[in-house]
Amino acid sequence: MKRTIILMLDSFGIGAADDADKFGDVGSDTFGHIAQMCAEGKANNGREGELKLPNLSRLGLAHAAKEATGAFAPGFGDNVDIIGAYGHCQELSSGKDTPSGHWEMAGVPVLFEWGYFSEHQNSFPKELTDKILERAGLTEFLGNCHASGTTILEELGEEHMKTGKPIFYTSADSVFQIACHEESFGLENLYRLCEIAREELEPYNIGRVIARPFVGTGPSDFARTGNRRDYAVEPPSKTVLDKLKQAGGEVVSVGKISDIYAHCGITKKVKASGLEDLFDATLEQIKQAGDNTIVFTNFVDFDSHYGHRRDVSGYAKALEYFDARLPELMALLEEGDLLLLTADHGCDPTWQGTDHTREFVPVLAYGAGLEAGSLGKRGSFADIGQSIASYFGLAAMEYGESFMPAR
């Protein structure tokens, strides 16, 4: 039996990457700073005390972070029996965004520059928004700026509901985001608008259009829903997911994975939102998975709910919940299965601003004949994709070095 379970802890970086200076992120450390705030009693909203991640620690998380930063995170140390192989990965890709991290992890680094909307106000070219509005049968829109997704709802959500004008906004990432009320504007209308925007953005080389539906009656109860959709461009070449699919294997997407890969290389898509539902869905898909299958889950809440919102307590509580459920998942593993835990970038909740941070990401690997211990510093996220290709006996990827035992 050959099955790979990939758990993507979206935004869970473990220390500033070697090139963090190019991004203004020197000193960032998502894991380390969360652990520090917990140890100092500054992350006690809904939880309390030091950050407790015993199962991730046994897989090698704290040791991987020590190798990345030079020191154990506060509250973590050598007093643990390591059962997994662990390392830290440097990103080759030009950006610190979600598609770049995911694609590189699957063997296809993004070596070109994405397009960006760098102006914080009046962010979008008029000729672009005019075309989108005309095709959608609309006349005006709101936003046109860099913004936090929750803040912009507080500021413009009511006006959107009164006028029917969609909210267009962006960030430091290569994204064009559209927020609309599910009921007053309509979910299908939002999706159609995003499809139009995706087509019109082709010349601008923007990585993703994101549909951001929300509900509620006013700023006090506006809330984004689980009906988000990402409209990504296709990866520039075949990922390891494509290769397994072409070889007759199965690739199960749980959560937003399928959207991130523009549905390429995916054989089954399972919708789930929220940490609990995503974990439940992952367990169910592992139970159903046969030979030559990848079950791939993105746990987006770490990023969207806690990283971008700079919510240290929330991030810590979510990590502890995730950690507490890992034994359930590991109990489902069969002999020969490969479990991989990693991240796509950082999003340090103690950092200035609301954007991602350029960090090393962990690679925690368990099973499939791997010996417990250090995998060292990995030169690319693509080492993960190359290792998956090696595990399944697929043709080698162009990028990355496998850390799997010799066949």
Curated annotation (Swiss-Prot):
Any single GO CC term annotated in Swiss-Prot or TrEMBL for this entry: cytosol
Localization, UniProt: Cytoplasm
GO MF, one example: magnesium ion binding
Gene3D superfamilies: Alkaline Phosphatase, subunit A, Phosphopentomutase
Residues engaged in binding Mn(2+) 1: 10, 344-345
The entry's keywords: Cytoplasm, Isomerase, Manganese, Metal-binding
Gene Ontology biological-process annotations: 2-deoxyribose 1-phosphate catabolic process; 5-phosphoribose 1-diphosphate biosynthetic process; metabolic compound salvage; nucleotide metabolic process
Enzyme Commission (EC) number: 5.4.2.7
Matches recorded under Pfam families: Metalloenzyme
Pathway membership: Carbohydrate degradation; 2-deoxy-D-ribose 1-phosphate degradation; D-glyceraldehyde 3-phosphate and acetaldehyde from 2-deoxy-alpha-D-ribose 1-phosphate: step 1/2
Catalytic activity: 2-deoxy-alpha-D-ribose 1-phosphate = 2-deoxy-D-ribose 5-phosphate; alpha-D-ribose 1-phosphate = D-ribose 5-phosphate
Cofactor(s) recorded in Swiss-Prot or TrEMBL: Mn(2+)
Function: Isomerase that catalyzes the conversion of deoxy-ribose 1-phosphate (dRib-1-P) and ribose 1-phosphate (Rib-1-P) to deoxy-ribose 5-phosphate (dRib-5-P) and ribose 5-phosphate (Rib-5-P), respectively.
Similarity remark: Belongs to the phosphopentomutase family.
Record-given protein name: Phosphopentomutase
